[in-house]
Amino acid sequence: MAKRKAAFYWMTVPALLLFFVFHTFPALQGVFYSFTNWNGFAKTYEFVGFKNYYYLFQDDNVGNAYWFTFKFAVVVTVIINVLSLLIAMGLNASIKARNFFRGVYFLPNILSVLIVGYIFNYLFSNVFTVWGENLGLGWLSTNLLGSQTLAWVGVVFVAVWQGIALNTILYLSGLQTIPTQLYEASGLDGANKWQEFWKITFPLIAPFFTINMVLAMKNALMVFDLIVALTNGGPGRATQSISHLIYTGGFEGGEFAYQSANSVIYFIVIAVISIVQIRYLQRRETDM
């Protein structure tokens, strides 16, 4: 028995040490530096208290980044969950080449975000514009990512295209847990497809809906790679997410301490949003 416990310790302790060294300790360092004026490379720094946090709320660039990120996250989360649920229901039906289509729809999830971003950057710049000119569509003949007002739509499109894959698989796994006898019984009672969805399907996949909503929102709030590959925050700062602002300001703009404070605030924001989502959606699960 003692040998078995020792084996568990030998497996657990190294993992915890690695997690602490490469995750927890740097995070605590970030909190520490958020109370200083360190620029990221100087040998000295001074403690400034909560000044960095105070100035964050006065910074228009920070406000614009939060506005874009929240707008982007809400739109992406809603679209991804609606489309992925519809696709999952289609893939769960008795159709030909069902396994083939399941593999095709999951393909975007295994591709690198940066690779997808650079590919779509090329498509928006060199392919879609040619299509627009040939079809006589003015809105498509110009690079969408170069528009101050519409660039975020292009980013949303790419994020949905790639993000929909994982959510579809999760919804599909939830749909496969529903006994077919329930649909047979509801058919005998005269229920239509819409009634079956709201009275049987959706209540029984509610836990999967909760997981997908939380994951989609969290991933959208943390968007970074896609912004770098598609717009790099431009044009101007029209598509600059909070993660992108923290990176560029902290590592390229000499604002390490200032953006450390920003990252602390943003961590709290994401944690609060996730907790609220989980509690609200889990309460709905029990009500259903």
Q: Where are each of the predicted segments found?
A:
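A structural signal for multi-pass alpha-helical bundles of membrane permease subunits
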Residues: 3-288
